[in-house]
Amino acid sequence: MGLIKEHCMTRTVYLNGEYFSENEAKISIFDRGFLMADAVYEVTSVLDGKLIDYKGHADRLNRSLDELDIKNPISYEELLEVHRELVRLNNIDEGLVYLQITRGAPSDRDFVYPNPDETDPTVVLFTQNKPGLANSQSAKNGLKVISINDERWGRRDIKTVQL
């Protein structure tokens, strides 16, 4: 029963041009996104099975990649098709598509950026189902929040791979 249950709950994800079961997708431990947080990401909401503001997210993705000098290995149209296909394959009516592009996986860990002509970026997309958000009390009434100062740059004493 455990194997059947696990199989039924498995999502389809996208990794470097191919679709995989989430349990089958593999990323190198030398990927700079993993070792150095050298990556960009976008999250596109899905409502009624449709992507919300895909163009805005794609434009920001391209700007972010340009700013970090990471080559974009996938065209706007191809990326849109991947988003739509993941929504379809995973039967997402309400949820999100998470996208991350890293500088890739050179053969060794190094602080020097790898030559973009020698190292391909890693492209990962997956979905998350978030049913009920649009009709939730929070969506209708809003949320109470508390804001705090962002102290990440003030904590350079912590050797974290994240910002």
Q: Where are the predicted features?
A:
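Helix-start/capping segments and mature chain N-termini
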Residues: 1-73, 77-85, 114-163
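Short secondary-structure capping/junction motifs at helix and strand boundaries
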Residues: 71-73, 89-100, 134-135
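Short, glycine/charge-rich beta-strand/loop segments that flank catalytic centers
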Residues: 75-84, 94-110
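Hydrophobic alpha-helical hairpins/lids featuring a short glycine-rich hinge
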Residues: 91, 110-116
